[in-house]
Design a protein with these regions (language model features):
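Bacterial N-terminal signal peptides that target proteins for export
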Residues: 1-9
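Sec/Tat signal peptide C-region and signal peptidase I cleavage site
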Residues: 17-23
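Short beta-strand-centered segments that line the small-molecule binding cleft or hinge
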Residues: 159
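Short, solvent-exposed mixed-charge patches
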Residues: 167-168
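Amphipathic alpha-helical segments
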Residues: 24-146
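Cleavable N-terminal signal peptides
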Residues: 10-11, 21
């Protein structure tokens, strides 16, 4: 009797494990490809490029003005038009402006990163929502990004389903 119970329990356990293994469904998406095809990304890239050009123009203006003033001061020094005290004042002024330019360069990079996050976050959220919808509708337990998959069957690629959800 105990033997029959043990065997029955073993069969039930094996049946449950096989049912669980067969029920799991995995897929993958090529998120980089999906993002590259989205018009929103193209618009965000365009906005970032415009901001970068604007900031670069301002930075270049600051550098050109600095170089012009530096050249003028050097000419005055060469002609003997500046006293040692005035030379020191001008040197301090140029040094503070150089620090200002360096700060601007750092702020420019920070602005670009912040703007990129601001523009891309809603797009990434939209793609993630579409992936979640496809997963729920298709009964997928997990969907991976193709960038992390070394091999995957073509049938497991749900990129086209996600593109359809996104309207691309």
């Amino acid at each position: 009797m105990k033997k029959i119970i043990k065997i029955s329990f073993l069969f039930v356990a094996i049946f449950c494990m096989t049912a669980t293994l067969q029920a799991q469904k995995f897929g993958y998406v090529n998120s980089a490809l999906i993002l590259s095809e989205m018009p929103e990304i193209k618009q965000a890239d365009s906005n970032l490029e415009a901001l970068q050009k604007q900031l670069m123009k301002k930075g270049e203006g600051m550098v050109q003005l600095f170089q012009k003033d530096y050249a003028e001061i050097q000419q005055k020094v060469a002609k003997g038009e500046l006293s040692p005290v005035q030379q020191e004042e001008q040197a301090k002024n140029l040094e503070s402006r150089q620090i200002e330019i360096q700060k601007f360069e750092q702020e420019m990079q920070e602005q670009m990163v912040a703007k990129r996050e601001e523009l891309y976050k809603p797009i990434y959220d939209k793609v993630n929502d579409a992936i979640k919808q496809v997963a729920k509708e298709g009964g997928y337990q997990m969907i991976f990004d193709a960038a992390t998959i070394l091999y995957g069957e073509e049938g497991a690629d749900v990129s086209s389903l996600v593109k359809t959800k996104l309207g691309i």
